[in-house]
Regions:
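Conserved nucleotide-sugar donor-binding catalytic segment
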Residues: 164-172
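Hydrophobic targeting segments
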Residues: 5-11, 34-37
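Conserved catalytic core of nucleotide-sugar-dependent glycosyltransferases
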Residues: 82-165
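Short beta-strand-to-loop acidic/aromatic patch adjacent to the donor-nucleotide binding site
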Residues: 61-72
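Short, well-formed alpha-helical segments that are part of the catalytic scaffolds
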Residues: 11, 15-30
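Glycine-rich, basic loop-to-helix element that forms the pyrophosphate-binding segment
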Residues: 42-56
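Acidic donor-binding/catalytic loop of UDP-sugar-dependent glycosyltransferases
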Residues: 71-85
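C-terminal catalytic/acceptor-binding lobe
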Residues: 171-229
């Protein structure tokens, strides 16, 4: 068996990135990954991510993992699992949480635009209970499972396949909706997407205010671009 290449792990951070959950979690995986950290990042995630979807990176990496800097990857089998998802399940894009269907309605959030029966995946979050820090696992549904849309906290791509079809992250969206718009674009290019059981803890409560102006502007753009009929 030929030796597998390192996973290229790409993230963006507003500071120097040294104290992020992601970098802390990558230390035990140094033999399996190479990090690209966009420090003091001011551009949209899509633009930053797309800079790594290049033929040059294909020389050293089969898989590129795009992950938020507040994600702690608590899985020493990360590399093997991603290769299994891509080589054996033939996924072109691998995520941790998503849905197998979508109906474009407002609010334009993946779990609000799909039936719970189509959900897949799981993500842990930190919580306080009785004055102590605990882990709360949000189980969306069975995995691995084919999906149409997935959450952008963790998306790994088969670099060769996405280059072949000319897929990139949708640069019309800086943060909100960049993930689900890019998934819909991937589906239109016949890329196969799905979840796989990789264990992480996400240090984020998610969207706090639907009425926040930046979110509302992004939602309107997404709704107008992808609404059918």
């Amino acid at each position: 068996m030929s030796k597998t290449k390192k996973i290229l792990v790409v993230t963006c951070t507003k500071n120097d990135g040294k104290d992020t959950q992601l970098l802390k979690s990558m230390a035990p995986l140094s033999d399996d990954v190479k990090m690209v950290v966009n420090i003091n990042n001011k551009c949209g995630l899509s633009k930053a991510y797309n800079k790594q979807l290049t033929p040059e990176n294909l020389v050293y990496h089969d898989i590129v993992l795009f992950v938020h800097d507040d994600v702690y990857v608590d899985d020493l089998k990360l590399k093997g699992k991603l290769y299994t998802a891509i080589n054996e399940l033939e996924y072109d894009i691998v995520g941790l949480a998503g849905a197998g269907e979508i109906k474009i309605t407002k609010p334009c959030l993946w779990h609000r635009m799909s039936r719970q029966e189509s959900w897949s995946g799981a993500v842990s979050h930190q919580m306080e209970l009785d004055g102590e820090s605990k882990l709360n696992v949000t189980s969306f549904g069975p995995w691995p499972r084919r999906c149409l849309i997935m959450d952008g906290l963790f998306l790994a791509v088969d670099l060769k396949r996405v280059l072949e079809v000319g897929w990139k992250f949708n640069e019309n969206y800086d943060f909100h909706h960049y993930d689900i718009s890019s998934c819909l674009d991937a589906n239109s290019k016949k890329l196969k997407m799905g979840t796989y059981p990789i264990y992480v803890t996400h240090d984020s409560p998610g969207l706090k205010d639907y009425n926040e102006p930046t979110y509302q502007q992004s939602e309107m753009r997404f709704y107008n671009e992808y609404k059918r009929g």
